[in-house]
Amino acid sequence: NGITKHIIKKVYKKKYKIQKIDGLPQKQVTPPKEVYERIKSDNKLIGKARAVETDLTFFSNKFKPPLKNAIITGVYGSQRILNGIPKSPHYGLDFAAKEGTKIKAMLDGVVTLAENDLYYTGGTIIFDHGHGVSTLYMHLKDVLVEEGQKIKQGDLIGTVGSTGRSTGAHLDIRLNWFNIKLDPMSVLDK
Protein backbone atom coordinates (compact mmCIF):
# COMPACT_ATOMS: atom_id res chain seq x y z
CA ASN A 1 0.00 0.00 0.00
CA GLY A 2 3.04 2.28 -0.22
CA ILE A 3 3.32 2.95 3.52
CA THR A 4 6.76 2.62 5.08
CA LYS A 5 7.06 1.91 8.78
CA HIS A 6 10.17 2.24 10.92
CA ILE A 7 10.18 0.16 14.08
CA ILE A 8 12.92 0.34 16.68
CA LYS A 9 13.35 -2.70 18.89
CA LYS A 10 15.72 -3.02 21.80
CA VAL A 11 18.04 -6.02 21.55
CA TYR A 12 18.76 -7.75 24.83
CA LYS A 13 21.86 -9.77 25.59
CA LYS A 14 20.93 -13.38 26.26
CA LYS A 15 22.59 -15.48 28.93
CA TYR A 16 23.27 -19.01 27.76
CA LYS A 17 23.61 -22.11 29.88
CA ILE A 18 27.05 -23.43 30.76
CA GLN A 19 27.48 -27.20 30.41
CA LYS A 20 30.46 -28.74 32.18
CA ILE A 21 31.42 -32.26 31.18
CA ASP A 22 34.34 -33.82 33.04
CA GLY A 23 36.04 -37.20 32.83
CA LEU A 24 36.12 -37.35 29.03
CA PRO A 25 38.94 -39.16 27.23
CA GLN A 26 41.49 -36.52 26.15
CA LYS A 27 40.98 -37.34 22.43
CA GLN A 28 37.34 -36.16 22.78
CA VAL A 29 38.45 -32.82 24.20
CA THR A 30 41.46 -32.11 21.98
CA PRO A 31 41.84 -34.33 18.92
CA PRO A 32 45.29 -35.80 18.21
CA LYS A 33 47.28 -34.13 15.42
CA GLU A 34 47.04 -37.22 13.22
CA VAL A 35 43.30 -36.62 12.70
CA TYR A 36 43.56 -32.91 11.76
CA GLU A 37 43.47 -33.65 8.01
CA ARG A 38 40.42 -35.87 8.47
CA ILE A 39 38.64 -33.12 10.43
CA LYS A 40 39.54 -30.60 7.70
CA SER A 41 38.15 -32.95 5.04
CA ASP A 42 34.95 -33.55 7.06
CA ASN A 43 34.46 -29.78 7.46
CA LYS A 44 34.78 -29.30 3.68
CA LEU A 45 32.08 -31.94 3.08
CA ILE A 46 29.76 -30.27 5.59
CA GLY A 47 30.45 -26.79 4.20
CA LYS A 48 29.73 -27.93 0.64
CA ALA A 49 26.48 -29.62 1.70
CA ARG A 50 25.31 -26.48 3.54
CA ALA A 51 26.25 -24.14 0.68
CA VAL A 52 23.58 -25.55 -1.65
CA GLU A 53 21.16 -22.95 -2.97
CA THR A 54 17.96 -24.14 -4.64
CA ASP A 55 14.53 -22.70 -5.35
CA LEU A 56 12.85 -25.23 -3.04
CA THR A 57 10.48 -23.68 -0.48
CA PHE A 58 10.13 -26.55 2.00
CA PHE A 59 11.49 -24.33 4.79
CA SER A 60 8.24 -22.32 4.82
CA ASN A 61 6.35 -25.28 6.35
CA LYS A 62 6.20 -26.27 10.02
CA PHE A 63 9.16 -28.29 11.29
CA LYS A 64 8.06 -31.43 13.16
CA PRO A 65 10.15 -32.87 16.03
CA PRO A 66 12.44 -35.67 14.78
CA LEU A 67 11.81 -37.93 17.80
CA LYS A 68 8.72 -38.77 19.84
CA ASN A 69 8.73 -38.00 23.58
CA ALA A 70 12.45 -37.20 23.68
CA ILE A 71 14.01 -35.11 26.43
CA ILE A 72 16.03 -32.05 25.41
CA THR A 73 19.44 -32.27 27.09
CA GLY A 74 21.44 -29.62 25.24
CA VAL A 75 20.35 -26.25 23.90
CA TYR A 76 21.55 -23.81 21.28
CA GLY A 77 24.17 -21.32 22.47
CA SER A 78 25.20 -23.15 25.62
CA GLN A 79 28.89 -22.90 26.47
CA ARG A 80 30.58 -26.29 26.63
CA ILE A 81 33.44 -26.79 29.07
CA LEU A 82 35.09 -30.16 28.50
CA ASN A 83 37.46 -31.38 31.21
CA GLY A 84 37.82 -27.76 32.32
CA ILE A 85 38.64 -26.47 28.80
CA PRO A 86 36.15 -23.95 27.32
CA LYS A 87 35.06 -25.00 23.82
CA SER A 88 32.87 -23.45 21.12
CA PRO A 89 29.24 -22.85 22.02
CA HIS A 90 26.81 -25.62 21.15
CA TYR A 91 24.90 -24.64 18.02
CA GLY A 92 22.36 -27.43 18.08
CA LEU A 93 19.58 -29.02 20.04
CA ASP A 94 20.28 -32.35 21.75
CA PHE A 95 17.61 -34.99 22.38
CA ALA A 96 18.40 -37.89 24.71
CA ALA A 97 17.05 -41.18 23.37
CA LYS A 98 17.83 -44.88 23.42
CA GLU A 99 20.27 -46.13 20.83
CA GLY A 100 18.35 -47.36 17.80
CA THR A 101 15.38 -45.01 18.28
CA LYS A 102 13.89 -44.10 14.89
CA ILE A 103 14.57 -40.58 13.61
CA LYS A 104 12.01 -38.91 11.33
CA ALA A 105 12.61 -36.06 8.88
CA MET A 106 11.50 -32.73 10.37
CA LEU A 107 10.60 -31.34 6.97
CA ASP A 108 10.55 -32.23 3.27
CA GLY A 109 14.01 -31.92 1.74
CA VAL A 110 16.76 -33.25 -0.46
CA VAL A 111 19.74 -35.07 1.07
CA THR A 112 22.98 -33.17 0.40
CA LEU A 113 25.16 -35.25 2.75
CA ALA A 114 24.82 -38.78 4.11
CA GLU A 115 27.94 -39.99 5.93
CA ASN A 116 28.38 -42.80 8.45
CA ASP A 117 31.58 -41.74 10.20
CA LEU A 118 32.63 -38.09 10.45
CA TYR A 119 35.14 -37.40 13.22
CA TYR A 120 33.10 -35.04 15.38
CA THR A 121 29.55 -35.77 14.25
CA GLY A 122 29.69 -39.51 13.45
CA GLY A 123 26.69 -40.62 11.37
CA THR A 124 25.54 -37.37 9.77
CA ILE A 125 22.74 -36.30 7.42
CA ILE A 126 22.22 -32.85 5.91
CA PHE A 127 19.03 -31.81 4.11
CA ASP A 128 18.48 -28.88 1.76
CA HIS A 129 15.11 -27.19 2.32
CA GLY A 130 15.60 -24.38 -0.19
CA HIS A 131 17.22 -20.96 -0.45
CA GLY A 132 20.19 -21.93 1.73
CA VAL A 133 18.16 -23.39 4.61
CA SER A 134 19.53 -26.74 5.79
CA THR A 135 19.13 -29.10 8.72
CA LEU A 136 21.73 -31.47 10.14
CA TYR A 137 21.17 -34.68 12.09
CA MET A 138 24.24 -35.94 13.93
CA HIS A 139 25.67 -38.87 15.96
CA LEU A 140 23.44 -41.40 14.15
CA LYS A 141 23.94 -45.13 14.55
CA ASP A 142 22.31 -45.83 11.19
CA VAL A 143 22.11 -43.47 8.21
CA LEU A 144 19.18 -44.71 6.11
CA VAL A 145 19.22 -42.18 3.25
CA GLU A 146 21.50 -41.39 0.30
CA GLU A 147 22.75 -38.14 -1.21
CA GLY A 148 20.30 -36.77 -3.78
CA GLN A 149 17.34 -38.61 -2.24
CA LYS A 150 14.10 -36.63 -1.83
CA ILE A 151 12.55 -37.03 1.60
CA LYS A 152 9.08 -36.22 2.91
CA GLN A 153 8.38 -34.91 6.39
CA GLY A 154 7.99 -37.85 8.77
CA ASP A 155 10.04 -40.30 6.65
CA LEU A 156 12.41 -42.60 8.56
CA ILE A 157 15.94 -41.30 7.91
CA GLY A 158 18.13 -42.96 10.55
CA THR A 159 18.48 -44.16 14.13
CA VAL A 160 19.86 -42.57 17.28
CA GLY A 161 23.44 -43.44 18.15
CA SER A 162 26.50 -42.22 20.00
CA THR A 163 28.94 -41.83 17.12
CA GLY A 164 31.62 -39.17 16.67
CA ARG A 165 32.38 -36.97 19.69
CA SER A 166 29.53 -38.09 21.91
CA THR A 167 29.15 -39.06 25.56
CA GLY A 168 25.98 -41.12 25.13
CA ALA A 169 23.10 -41.97 22.82
CA HIS A 170 21.39 -38.82 21.58
CA LEU A 171 20.38 -36.88 18.48
CA ASP A 172 21.93 -33.46 17.83
CA ILE A 173 20.03 -31.38 15.26
CA ARG A 174 21.22 -28.14 13.68
CA LEU A 175 19.58 -25.46 11.55
CA ASN A 176 21.55 -23.26 9.18
CA TRP A 177 20.99 -20.57 6.62
CA PHE A 178 24.10 -21.15 4.53
CA ASN A 179 26.89 -20.74 7.16
CA ILE A 180 24.76 -18.87 9.68
CA LYS A 181 23.85 -21.05 12.65
CA LEU A 182 20.25 -20.69 13.85
CA ASP A 183 18.41 -22.00 16.90
CA PRO A 184 16.43 -25.12 15.86
CA MET A 185 14.01 -24.57 18.75
CA SER A 186 12.81 -21.38 17.02
CA VAL A 187 11.22 -23.38 14.18
CA LEU A 188 10.10 -26.64 15.80
CA ASP A 189 6.33 -27.06 15.93
CA LYS A 190 5.51 -27.63 19.58
Q: Where are the language model's segments positioned?
A:
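Catalytic cores of peptidoglycan-degrading enzymes
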Residues: 65-190
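Non-catalytic extracellular/periplasmic "stalk"
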Residues: 1-76
